[in-house]
Amino acid sequence: TFYTRLLQDPRLTPELCATMRLFVSGSAPMLVDTHTQWQARTGHTILERYGMTETNMNTSNPYDGARRPGTVGMPLPGIELRIMDNAQEVAQGDIGTIEVRGPNVFKGYWKMPEKTAEELRPDGWFITGDLGQIDAEGYVSIVGRGKDLIITGGFNVYPKEVESLIDEIDGVLESAVIGLPHPDFGEAVVAVVVPSDPALTAEVVQAAAAQKLAKFKQPKQILLLSELPRNTMGKVQKKELRNIYATLFT
């Protein structure tokens, strides 16, 4: 969020950032477009990594070496990371739930034994709840949160894929894709879009999505808002959006 907001400021130049040593990102997956724009505007390549309260840092792109846009790098020394689905490790490149194990992982939730048992395996693996995949060279990509996965008509839709496409449309500042209850499909894909151009219409977004997305991935509804709800850390609150629009199709 901070990077996208700074990119909107014309004062952001290579000269302004000349004395900066390093820019990092790790609170939420960064779009490739944001990463690329930042490098072009400032001359700095953002170092993206992946961590959470329960584990501190899990992975990082290298300080010296290739920092790959769209990835959070590789597991840090001493930390194991695997991608799981239905208690089985998935094949390379497949999407599943990220689990981590190492000295960085917490002991459990304070006075919450049930939650601890649900998310921390007896052998030390922590179930992060994040969806991800690992490429052939070991770089990890975050696809989204498991709870944000949309199942529509029996098909899985990963919101980040749809958001990445929508965010590339001219006139779009940012977007959030959610699943809402639907009488026919179980869940319907809905895109909440913040325009950067007041002339942007829902029809333009819908047409662009129809060109590049499979039918089941295309939003059934496009909602235009002036801003997305966020918490104090700047993370988009999709739960709040789901609550606000829960009855959109019912």
Predicted regions and their residues:
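Gly/Ser/Thr-rich phosphate-binding loop
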Residues: 3, 7-68, 80, 87
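Short Gly/Pro-enriched turn/cap motifs at secondary-structure boundaries
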Residues: 66, 70-76, 120-123
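Acidic/polar alpha-helix N-cap and adjacent early helical turns
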Residues: 243-250
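Beta-strand->loop->alpha-helix junctions that form or flank phosphate-binding loops
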Residues: 47-54, 73-75, 178-181, 223
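Active-site glycine-centered loops adjacent to acidic/histidine catalytic or metal-binding residues
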Residues: 27, 51, 73, 130, ...
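Glycine-centered tight turns that cap/initiate beta-strands
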Residues: 11, 19, 43, 78, ...
